[in-house]
Amino acid sequence: NVFRFFPGDVVVKAAHARYAVEELGVKRPAVIFQTTAYGQSGRAELDRNLTALGRPAVFAEGLDVSVKDMLPVLSKVRESGADALLLHLHSGPTALVVRQARAMGLDIPIIAGSAMHQPETAALLAPSELAGVCAESGASPISESDPATRAFADAYRTAFDREPDAFALGQYDGVQKI
């Protein structure tokens, strides 16, 4: 048997796209994704959902995980006339895109993937770089008010001396179910 305790791209990318279009009013989204299997899956779901919402991406490009200079792709985002940038990248590239976008004055909302919600990713950025940035996440144990989730978060901090992320909560839930 296979157990999965973290929602897949079919779920989170639907929410990612809906938030951009329905909550932020995005009309011309750009998408930057990783060229890994992870990135391809997320990109496919973002494409499907943005198109279904009547807001297909005006620009989309994949990046290898090793890319450090994001200015070429960010320049293409700017040239496309995008009014928001949706990311489906790993942690390091997410931080690089956000930092370099802000440094070049690309002042559009950035709706990142779950990597941005990881405390380690946010710690790579200055608070000023995070202005106008949000992220989708399957869960947010550091934001929950539910007593059981708060107890998990407190125990996690005590055991690991760091903030729990959605992946930690998913693993915890998985072990509890077994």
Description of each model-found segment:
Residues 98-172:
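Extracellular/periplasmic periplasmic-binding protein-like sensory domains
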